[in-house]
Amino acid sequence: MSAVLNSASALTGQSPWAASRATVYNDKIVRQFSVAAVVWGVVSMLVGVFIAAQMTWPELNFGIPWLSFGRLRPLHTNAAIFAFGGCSLFATSYWVVQRTCQTRIISDKLAAFHFWGWQLVILAAAISLPLGYTRGKEYAELEWPISILIAVTWVAYAVVFFGTIGIRKVRHIYVANWFYGAFIIAVALLHIVNAAVMPAGIMKSYSVYAGVQDAMVQWWYGHNAVGFFLTAGFLGIVYYFIPKQAERPVYSYRLSIVHFWALIFTYMWAGPHHLHFTALPDWTQSLGMVFSLILLAPSWGGMINGVMTLSGAWHKLRDDPILRFMIVALSFYGIATFEGPMMSIKTVNSLSHYTDWNIAHVHGGTLGWVGFISMGAMYYLIPRLFGQKKMHSLKAIEIHFWVATIGIVFYIAAMWIAGVMQGLMWRSINPDGSLTYTFVESVKATFPFYLVRFCGGLLYFIGMLIMAWNVVMTATAGKPVDAVIPSNLAHA
């Protein structure tokens, strides 16, 4: 080995260490983010199960402010989206960009800063949110010092990702990198605009926007956080990992390009549908509704492209639980992207607005789409990152799949029924014009569905524990390895 390193260093003029480093991918950063994704997945689901229990048994607040639902709910959403989902995106994007560009990432140090900076953001959120430090904006609760750290860390990530594409050895930029790139650029734009504040203390600030403009900026951010963080980035996972696991090319590469541009153009305009029946100008609400309906076409185009990649390999779904995770994730993506445009129609929204139907919708997208595609990708990555041919237990993956799927179905079905029931009860009017039901009566009627929701969430959490055990067993049975960069210029 030393002779090889010395000869390589003689040819390149580099030190033996640098020469060896140039011949392998940086899989350490992928390994770190992959393990972090599993850890934060367990934590985020644990908090989710606890607050679901609080909705069923309010005594679990224990009269302690930092254990109250109002403080733990944003912790749950931030952990699920930015800790679990974020680490999954970072791990997969670093894996994909290196292999499709057939080069090592441009800077190991910046990548390391990205990892530790992001973990610091997560820990800061885990401390500050239960203590009550919040901006009060959904998905953007973190106060200005943490927002600055997010921005700096994000810039480091962007430099590494786009810098690696800049030094690629393959002329073509694979479509998965397009989706990752759009996710990185859009989230940076959204975060910078929505996080514009006037500090009023070390952990207190006021938005530079006011009134309805503040609401519009918030839901331009909130909707597109879903559109680019929870959609575009994870579509990058779809376009790399499903073909790899299925051992089939993307069904239609041309459709993937059309899918990309249609999605990128349309998503940015749909935010106003979150503000139907508010002080937002009616024309703006209608504009958001129209673009939401248009979104159905590119969303379903991408879903069909992913599912049809299995053409000629449908039998693999019987025997491959990892592929099953990925395809069922696409099914939930299809459900969520049909339901979203439908709920943006003002007539439908008049029933669904402020009800638990919204909870069913977002959890179908987050647990079903984001969760399942992330789990499938992690099951693909973990054995390869630790020098193993497969996960420790395929049977455990099978059990995880069915436990999590049943949990999601319980959760979503309960919240769908509860949401429609709430909407109908709230709009029910007596002949004299008075409300038929008080708000408290609607809460009482919802209670059984909260219990079912808790059971569904508990099953999903148990699935995460099974995954964590499987990952630990796989990692301890192997050892960390960095893959060798192939000499032939072909997509990996």
Language-model-detected regions and their locations in the chain:
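Hydrophobic cores of alpha-helical transmembrane segments in multi-pass integral membrane proteins
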Residues: 2-3, 31-133, 144-165, 177-202, ...
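Cytosolic juxtamembrane amphipathic/interface segments immediately preceding
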Residues: 18-32
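Extracellular/oxidizing-compartment recognition motifs
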Residues: 201-209
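Membrane-interface helix termini and inter-helical loops of multi-pass transporters
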Residues: 63, 135-138, 278-281, 349-353
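Active-site-proximal inter-transmembrane loops
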Residues: 208-217, 352, 357-359
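Short, charged/polar, low-complexity loop and linker segments
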Residues: 14-21, 442-446
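Short, highly charged, low-complexity non-transmembrane loops/tails of multi-pass membrane proteins
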Residues: 479-492
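N-terminal acidic, proline/glycine-rich, low-complexity intrinsically disordered segments
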Residues: 1-12
